[in-house]
């Protein structure tokens, strides 16, 4: 890491995070002037107004220009989506347990007196709440499932970066002008053209700013850098980039502009090493210094950490630690099935090793063709302990997409959005992460409904659980589709849509079915606890008959809080096998019930003509979802978290080592889980020391690939280090750990999430 990158990294975290009202005020000012116009045009005009008037800055020593807010890591509001939680939490932002922000008293006044009164009863949240049935609301209130993205932009998408970089804005504007001429009444084309032209003007604002700063700069080197930024910006406003610097700059400008359009999570980066490779090679051919090109890439990696999301307190529990979702996958396959690893794949990991920040959320695609040098570079990066990169298995993901009707060429081009959500770059609107389904809560409901049922059998209970899962899935689908329609009718994204195939051909926004592939991704959570509970219940009640069903239910209701309850809990934990230890009897329960969940989910269609697709990952939702479930037959206390990750074993229950964990997960139908899965594994640092440690990890990754799991990620850290960080956070400000599908600064997490990470089993190889 160069001195410049070190200083940029330090400066990014030097000040307290604040809330900025600027976007909200500009958006509202435009909206007041466009009453009665079509929603998509109002949205486009509001975004264009922001791009014209928002304050811009180029910070000291930056090589890549473009900041969403003048102050680093500021949160921005979207009252047009949901003004109510913002009003409720204005006074809590600086002191809440998770994701704190400072906000001035004047900004609180402006929000209460100007912004909220305008957006009350005008927001997307009003529409969604008005459409939700009482039954759906009751299920979400008890957290049987959650409906996400009701208060913010949807995001969770990868635009067609090759289209942006290989054509340039000037050519794209000309193409959109032709569409407008051919279909002058099409509001989508009008909105997209308006925003493409506004993007050009916004980039030119940076050119002018850089020139002004250069004119007043006394440092010769910095003046030259500013003039180069100005030159690159003027070029990018009209022409396609030629060099790596130009390509990185246009790439980042568009990221910032799309943030203004929707203020959404997970506008992800796709296959960065593939589409950026020609520009990197051109710069090398032109004689650019390889060390400087690496510094450019490190600059871009630092910039990815400038964007944080302002979430509600509730949402921050589900998505703790600012998971922005700047996710990129490296390596993988070409469209003809050959290895896609290239020199930039290695450089992306090298640059990450230098900066070691939570973003970008890098991943590596592994397959039977992956070569040893790249696998060792991957293992080396994992050993740094930040949880990056995560690993995805082409041997599972490509067939998963083929089963969903994706072409072979497109399936081989897959990438990931957000945490682990599988997507086809530039061709998919997957509505990933639209809902989370609490499988353990469903079991709890079934247990209590059977109190006093002397005729209950284990098979009968299983059938009731399946039926109840099916019933609540119908309600989850209903709520998800209402949210889907809400985004269509209230929050179209015409600029983003102009970079998604087949929106231009159809003349429709992604929210209106314009994309080639249309999915709705929903997550089943708690499968490890569910299978552990049913296996123990079957043994204790129906096979060994040590307790009647009602007696066990009474112990659970009391939360094991009696001497007899403590003995029962000890037996439930210690005498019955647990998922994650390669025990067929319990693993098969997981496989059967998760398959049932998946097959039920995939029956349903969304308003865009696509289908629901199942996944299993938690982000940090295993903590709040566990808080609403009482004590369970796996020995879990009432309110205790669920198993982390999605497919991970329950904390402390994976006693047979990491290979046994892999074998348990391999018994699940990983191919069915086409919205993504998540497996957390924690290693002690000592087990990965030296060349031998790296080779053991590389061998473990090959075993993961051969066993056909879909995903795995790692924490490499001692629990003692994490406990010290809890006690002395000021000494561990830079400590990055893996949460679930993303990494975060440990000291920025709430204590409940910190404790969860500490308690995860630390394995040795």
Swiss-Prot record:
Protein name: Probable dehydratase PflD
Gene Ontology CC terms: cytosol
Gene Ontology MF: a single term: lyase activity
Taxonomic path: Bacteria, Pseudomonadati, Pseudomonadota, Gammaproteobacteria, Enterobacterales
Family affiliation: Belongs to the glycyl radical enzyme (GRE) family.
InterPro entries: Form_AcTrfase_GR_CS, Gly_radical, GRE, PFL2/GDeHydtase_fam, PFL_dom
Protein function: Probably shows dehydratase activity.
Alphabetical keyword list: Lyase, Organic radical
PROSITE patterns: GLY_RADICAL_1, GLY_RADICAL_2, PFL
Organism of provenance: Escherichia coli (strain K12)
Residues found modified as Glycine radical: 741
């Amino acid at each position: 890491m160069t001195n410049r990158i070190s200083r940029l990294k330090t400066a990014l975290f030097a000040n307290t995070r604040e809330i900025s009202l600027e976007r909200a005020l500009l958006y509202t000012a435009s909206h007041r002037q466009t009453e009665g116009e079509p929603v998509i045009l109002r949205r486009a005009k509001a975004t264009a107004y922001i791009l014209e008037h928002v304050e811009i800055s180029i910070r000291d020593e930056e090589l890549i220009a473009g900041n969403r807010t003048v102050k680093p890591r500021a949160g921005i509001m979207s009252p047009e989506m949901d003004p109510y939680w913002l009003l409720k939490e204005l006074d809590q932002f600086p002191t809440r347990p998770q994701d704190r922000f400072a906000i001035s008293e004047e900004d609180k006044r402006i929000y209460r007196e100007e912004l909220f009164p305008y957006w009350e009863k005008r927001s997307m949240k009003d529409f969604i709440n008005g459409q939700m049935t009482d039954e759906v609301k009751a299920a979400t209130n008890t957290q049987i499932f959650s409906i996400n993205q009701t208060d913010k932009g949807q995001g969770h998408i990868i635009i067609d970066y090759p289209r942006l970089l290989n054509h340039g804005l000037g050519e794209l504007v000309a193409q959109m002008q032709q569409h407008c001429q051919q279909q002058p009444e099409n509001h989508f084309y009008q909105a997209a053209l308006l925003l493409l032209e506004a993007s050009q003007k916004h980039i030119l604002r940076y050119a002018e700013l850089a020139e002004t700063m250069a004119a007043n700069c006394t440092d010769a080197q910095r003046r030259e850098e500013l003039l180069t930024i100005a030159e690159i910006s003027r070029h990018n406003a009209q022409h396609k980039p030629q060099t790596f610097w130009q390509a990185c700059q246009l790439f980042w400008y568009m990221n910032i502009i799309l943030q203004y359009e929707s203020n959404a999570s997970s506008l992800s980066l796709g296959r960065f090493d593939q589409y950026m490779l020609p520009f990197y090679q051109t710069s090398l051919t032109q004689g650019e210094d390889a060390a400087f090109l690496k510094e450019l890439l490190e600059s871009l990696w630092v910039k990815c950490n400038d964007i944080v999301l302002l979430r509600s307190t509730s949402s921050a529990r589900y998505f703790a630690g600012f998971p922005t979702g700047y996710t990129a996958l490296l390596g993988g396959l070409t469209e003809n099935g050959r290895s896609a690893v290239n020199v930039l794949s290695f450089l992306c990991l090298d640059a990450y090793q230098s900066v070691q920040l939570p973003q970008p959320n890098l991943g590596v695609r592994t397959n039977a063709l992956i070569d040893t040098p790249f696998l060792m570079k991957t293992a080396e990066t994992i050993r740094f302990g930040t949880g990056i990169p995560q690993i995805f298995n082409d041997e599972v993901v490509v067939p998963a997409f083929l089963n969903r009707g994706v072409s072979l060429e497109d399936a081989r081009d897959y990438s990931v959005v957000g945490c682990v959500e599988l997507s086809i770059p530039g061709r998919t609107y997957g509505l990933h992460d639209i809902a989370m389904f609490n499988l353990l809560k469903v079991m709890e409901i079934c247990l209590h409904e059977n109190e006093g049922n002397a005729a209950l059998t284990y098979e009968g209970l299983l059938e009731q659980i399946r039926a109840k899962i099916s019933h609540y899935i119908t309600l989850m689908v209903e709520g998800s589709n209402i949210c889907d329609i809400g985004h269509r009718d209230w929050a179209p994204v015409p600029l983003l849509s102009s970079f998604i195939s087949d929106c231009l051909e159809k003349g429709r926004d992604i929210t209106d079915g314009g994309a080639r592939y249309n999915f709705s991704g929903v997550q089943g959570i708690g499968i490890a606890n569910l299978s552990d509970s049913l296996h123990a219940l079957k043994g204790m009640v129906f096979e060994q008959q040590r307790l009647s069903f009602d007696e066990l239910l009474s112990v659970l209701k009391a939360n094991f809080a009696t001497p007899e309850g403590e003995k029962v809990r000890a037996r439930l934990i210690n005498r019955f096998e647990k998922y994650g230890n390669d025990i067929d009897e319990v693993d098969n329960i997981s496989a059967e019930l998760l398959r049932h969940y998946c097959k039920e989910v995939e029956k349903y269609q969304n308003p865009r003509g696509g289908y629901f697709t199942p996944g299993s990952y938690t982000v940090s939702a295993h903590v709040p979802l566990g808080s609403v479930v009482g004590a369970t037959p796996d020995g879990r206390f009432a309110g205790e978290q669920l198993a982390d990750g999605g497919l991970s074993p329950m904390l402390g229950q994976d006693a047979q080592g990491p290979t046994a964990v892999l074998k348990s997960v391999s018994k699940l139908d990983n191919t069915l889980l086409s919205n993504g899965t998540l497996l957390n594994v924690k290693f002690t640092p000592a087990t990965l020391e030296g060349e031998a440690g790296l080779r053991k990890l590389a061998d473990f990754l090959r075993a993961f690939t051969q066993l056909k799991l879909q995903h795995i990620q790692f924490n490499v850290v001692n629990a003692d280090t994490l406990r010290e960080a809890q006690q002395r956070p000021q000494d561990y400000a830079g400590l990055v750990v893996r949460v679930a599908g993303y990494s975060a600064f440990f000291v920025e997490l709430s204590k409940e999430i910190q404790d969860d990470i500490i308690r995860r089993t630390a394995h040795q190889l």
